[in-house]
């Protein structure tokens, strides 16, 4: 099991979240620790599974995916599928970026990206509602994203 992260590990993770391509020399200067220590800590964080991968943050507007919507779904238990099976089918739909099984009045929460609201509607009507086990849905289109972390 991973040991508790110290202050330096946490600062290193924050820097890598901002720019995963930051070089070790720059990270060393920012954190005030030797380059060998930065290298060792990154290696350890990867080996312990704390860092799962190094990734990018796309500009979705430039990719013509500037509309973000969140969709709540009620699971239909009479479908013959488990809630997890329904979630896994939903995860295969192009444009669905996140699928969460949640507690409360609703059973699933999705994050969808599309070029516009009409395309979100097509995803909901033509794809999502065709999946067995999907009951009622509520779609909420985001006006603006104030904060989004990777």
UniProtKB/Swiss-Prot annotation:
<dbReference type="GO" id="GO:0043565">
    <property type="term" value="F:sequence-specific DNA binding"/>
</dbReference>
<dbReference type="InterPro" id="IPR036390">
    <property type="entry name" value="WH_DNA-bd_sf"/>
</dbReference>
<feature type="domain" description="HTH asnC-type">
    <location>
        <begin position="5"/>
        <end position="66"/>
    </location>
</feature>
<protein>
    <recommendedName>
        <fullName>Uncharacterized HTH-type transcriptional regulator PYRAB16920</fullName>
    </recommendedName>
</protein>
<dbReference type="InterPro" id="IPR019887">
    <property type="entry name" value="Tscrpt_reg_AsnC/Lrp_C"/>
</dbReference>
<keyword id="KW-0238">DNA-binding</keyword>
<dbReference type="InterPro" id="IPR011008">
    <property type="entry name" value="Dimeric_a/b-barrel"/>
</dbReference>
<dbReference type="InterPro" id="IPR011991">
    <property type="entry name" value="ArsR-like_HTH"/>
</dbReference>
<dbReference type="InterPro" id="IPR019888">
    <property type="entry name" value="Tscrpt_reg_AsnC-like"/>
</dbReference>
<feature type="DNA-binding region" description="H-T-H motif">
    <location>
        <begin position="24"/>
        <end position="43"/>
    </location>
</feature>
<dbReference type="GO" id="GO:0005829">
    <property type="term" value="C:cytosol"/>
</dbReference>
<dbReference type="InterPro" id="IPR036388">
    <property type="entry name" value="WH-like_DNA-bd_sf"/>
</dbReference>
<keyword id="KW-0805">Transcription regulation</keyword>
<dbReference type="Pfam" id="PF13412">
    <property type="entry name" value="HTH_24"/>
</dbReference>
<dbReference type="GO" id="GO:0043200">
    <property type="term" value="P:response to amino acid"/>
</dbReference>
<dbReference type="InterPro" id="IPR000485">
    <property type="entry name" value="AsnC-type_HTH_dom"/>
</dbReference>
<keyword id="KW-0804">Transcription</keyword>
<dbReference type="Pfam" id="PF01037">
    <property type="entry name" value="AsnC_trans_reg"/>
</dbReference>
